[in-house]
Amino acid sequence: MRKPTALIILDGFGLREETYGNAVAQAKKPNFDGYWNKFPHTTLTACGEAVGLPEGQMGNSEVGHLNIGAGRIVYQSLTRVNVAIREGEFDKNETFQSAIKSVKEKGTALHLFGLLSDGGVHSHMNHMFALLRLAAKEGVEKVYIHAFLDGRDVGPKTAQSYIDATNEVIKETGVGQFATISGRYYSMDRDKRWDRVEKCYRAMVNGEGPTYKSAEECVEDSYANGIYDEFVLPSVIVNEDNTPVATINDDDAVIFYNFRPDRAIQIARVFTNEDFREFDRGEKVPHIPEFVCMTHFSETVDGYVAFKPMNLDNTLGEVVAQAGLKQLRIAETEKYPHVTFFFSGGREAEFPGEERILINSPKVATYDLKPEMSIYEVTDALVNEIENDKHDVIILNFANCDMVGHSGMMEPTIKAVEATDECLGKVVEAILAKDGVALITADHGNADEELTSEGEPMTAHTTNPVPFIVTKNDVELREDGILGDIAPTMLTLLGVEQPKEMTGKTIIK
């Protein structure tokens, strides 16, 4: 009989004493509360510099899983780019310089697209502002902005403030015009809803979609129709004569300034894959010799990379594999890349002895319509694996508290927490029945704050600490832990030596 050591990541499950707007506190969760009271527990920091982000920056799933899997603080793309701007290296970046040289020589346009907010999860508008300043410095005349509106990592109705900030930089530099506006629901889909991506592509390339004289007018009209930032229809900004300010054409260059890959891949593929088949792009398929991605998005995206990946050696998955242990990664679609690619330090391939189980997320418009998502199917599949004695190490993600938490709606999020708790109980009982040990934690908060103090929906992640429980009564845990300390703790429990690259410290005293 194998005695599995399982890491259970309750995505978006933060801890906060205040119960107002706190779906985690208001939900009935007898299993979690029981384990918290019965077993050694502590809290971990999952935001800011503890996970390689700027101070005070909320954590997110990509960052959380990278830090957990690496067993160290992993300096994030946001921090890397910020430092490059601060130290003057950003403007010297060869990939940016090559794109600028190309448009200057050919007299073509430079298009900047990405998520326009200061959420810092997928992008940061300061990086786009740095690109505007660089373009101005280098004498690029035609610079067009294709703004993806957020409303998810920031407040749901905040787009206007980011448009205003952009207009200030346009005024300061003398370059840049808004060309298209679209909500991230369309431009940043990651679930193969290609009909959404197609609307965005057609606006950018063909000038198809609702037309407005300004970005401000687009947002105002959307709000008047009850459509907020995330869901704004891909729209085209037009000149006085109703012609598009700009479309993307042959020999133009693109800099896609999102730094997080998962929601950038699909739209990038439409522009970079010659044999793209997910939808018919129509007669006009612009040839873009310089398509620049801020970071490495995927092998499926044929673009240049401005900030190339940093190699993360000896992640938990690799160390476990080298020790000859069998490991399982399991999640539903929305969090599958997190327990595989991100947890393995940005590696797509499996390690020897690694098995992966993907359970499809339900096809609903938004997850508040189905707060349980596919958690029961994930749980059934995992309990079956545990009972069959197949794995020494299990990495599980329950997506609900995060994905439903993003709705900013209390009732569905409470249901999500309660479904998570029910399934947590089933998984932990199966592990304990095999004399195994479960480590229960989260990658960041979300469901712990669903309402602002004004009673408005709070759709973003939080900076609250996350739980850490070890279902083993003969250990003592220290305070001040961070996500990067989880892997060393697991290795302690497994009796496997911690490699020098893992600079985290075990939480077991």
From Swiss-Prot:
Keyword Metal-binding tagged: yes
Keyword vocabulary terms for this entry: Glycolysis, Isomerase, Manganese, Metal-binding, Phosphoprotein, Sporulation
Biological processes per GO annotation: carbohydrate metabolic process; glucose catabolic process; glycolytic process; sporulation resulting in formation of a cellular spore
GO molecular function: manganese ion binding; phosphoglycerate mutase activity
Gene3D superfamilies given in the database record: Alkaline Phosphatase, subunit A, BPG-independent phosphoglycerate mutase, domain B
UniProt-annotated binding residues for Mn(2+) 1: 402, 406, 461
Residues involved in Mn(2+) 2 binding: 11, 61, 443-444
Annotated disulfide bonds: none
Name of encoding gene: gpmI
Name used for this protein in its record: 2,3-bisphosphoglycerate-independent phosphoglycerate mutase
Record EC number: 5.4.2.12
